[in-house]
From Swiss-Prot:
Residues 1-43 form the F-box domain. InterPro entries: At3g26010-like_b-prop, F-box-like_dom_sf, F-box_dom, SCF_F-box_component. It comes from the Eukaryota. The lineage of its organism: Eukaryota, Viridiplantae, Streptophyta, Embryophyta, Tracheophyta. This is Putative F-box protein At3g28280.
Length: 311
C-alpha cells in the first residue's frame, strides 16, 4: 500500500474505526505523519459526522443514561459515554462519589465539568475532566470572591482539534443569570461579568458547550421556554455576548419536553408537534420536525431557527 498516492491512502484509512487506523502509525513514519495530520482529522470528521449524532448532549443531569452512544466503534470507544463518565466519577471520588455530579458537557473536545450536588455554594469544588482519557484538573478556588454560585457550563476554544483554552462559567445564585463568575485557563484567574438577561431556571438537561458558546434552555417570567446562548469567545470584545431565542414551535404544545442535541457541528432541536393545514380543515398529528441553530455573519450565535420535516 506504500505505492498508493497519499490522498487515496487517506481515503481508505479514514473509513476505518479510530482504534484500527491509529495502530497503522507504527507501520512507517509516512503513515504516522498522515494519520496525525490536520488534513486527515478533518477528512475523518467530514465523512463520519453526517451519519453519527453526538451523545454527549443527550445525557441529562440524572444518573440514568438517556441514549447509548451510536457508533462507539467508529469513534474508538469500547463502551457508552455514560459508562466512561460513571466509572470516572467512582474512581475519582470513591466513597464521596454521590456528592458530585456532572454539570455540563463540552461536545467539542469531550470534556465535562464536575462539582458538588448542591445548587448554590459559596466556595464549591470544580473539576474539568476527560472521562475517556481519565485526565482531570481541579479549578482554583473562587472563595475570595465571596459569591454564592451555581455551575453553568464550560466553553472551549480549539484549533485543528487541539484544545487551546477553556472557560468555566458559574452564575451568582442570588442574581440568577445577571452576574457570571468566569474562570479562564489562559490567565488562571476568576473574573466577574454582568449580562443583561432576565430568564430563570434550567430544564432537566445540562447546558451544552459548542464552538466556544454555552447553550441551555431557560424559562421567561411568563413560563415560556427559550434558548439562551453565551458566547465566551466573541471576537473584538472582552464581554460575554448573550442571545435569547424563542423556539420555532412557540405557542404549540410539543409532545416531548424540549431539549437540545448536536449534529454535524450545529445545535439541533427536534420535537413532535401538531400542525393545522392552511385551510384549517385537517390537523396532522405527530408531524416530526427538527431545526438547526446556524451561524450568522460568521459568528456562532443563535439566529431564528428554520424548520425542516424529517423524512
Amino acid at each position: 500500500m506504500n505505492s498508493l498516492p497519499e490522498d487515496l491512502l487517506a481515503m481508505i484509512l479514514v473509513k476505518l474505526p479510530i482504534k484500527i487506523f491509529t495502530t497503522f502509525k507504527i507501520v512507517c513514519t509516512q503513515w504516522e505523519s498522515m494519520v496525525d495530520s490536520p488534513y486527515f482529522r478533518d477528512l475523518f470528521l467530514s465523512i463520519h459526522q453526517n451519519s453519527h449524532y453526538s451523545s454527549w448532549s443527550i445525557l441529562s443531569r440524572c444518573d440514568e443514561e438517556v441514549i447509548a452512544h451510536y457508533g462507539c466503534n467508529t469513534w474508538g470507544l469500547q463502551r457508552s459515554l455514560h459508562f466512561y463518565i460513571s466509572s470516572f466519577l467512582t474512581k475519582k471520588f470513591e466513597t464521596q462519589r454521590n456528592n458530585y455530579k456532572v454539570w455540563s458537557y463540552s461536545t467539542d473536545v469531550g470534556m465535562i465539568l464536575i462539582s458538588e450536588n448542591c445548587i448554590c455554594v459559596k466556595n464549591r469544588s470544580l473539576y474539568v475532566a476527560n472521562p475517556v482519557s481519565q485526565e482531570c484538573v481541579e479549578i482554583p478556588s473562587h472563595g475570595y470572591l465571596k459569591k454564592v454560585s451555581c455551575p453553568l457550563g464550560i466553553a472551549t476554544r480549539t484549533e485543528n482539534g487541539v484544545l487551546l483554552d477553556y472557560k468555566v462559567v458559574l452564575f451568582n445564585g442570588s442574581d440568577t443569570f445577571r452576574r457570571l463568575l468566569i474562570y479562564s485557563s489562559q490567565t488562571g484567574m476568576w473574573s466577574i461579568n454582568t449580562v443583561d438577561l432576565t430568564v430563570s431556571g434550567f430544564h432537566n438537561q445540562s447546558p451544552i458547550s459548542l464552538h466556544g458558546s454555552i447553550h441551555w434552555i431557560a424559562s421567561t417570567s411568563h413560563s415560556e421556554d427559550v434558548a439562551v446562548s453565551f458566547d465566551l469567545y466573541a471576537t473584538g470584545t472582552s464581554s460575554v455576548q448573550c442571545r435569547v431565542t424563542t423556539f420555532p414551535d412557540f405557542g404549540k404544545h410539543p409532545k416531548f419536553t424540549r431539549s437540545f442535541s448536536t449534529c454535524q457541528g450545529s445545535l439541533m432541536y427536534m420535537n413532535i408537534i401538531s400542525i393545522t393545514k392552511v385551510d384549517g380543515s385537517l390537523e396532522i398529528i405527530s408531524a416530526r420536525l427538527y431545526w438547526f441553530l446556524k451561524e450568522k455573519n460568521g459568528r456562532k450565535v443563535l439566529p431564528q431557527c428554520q424548520p425542516t420535516p424529517l423524512s
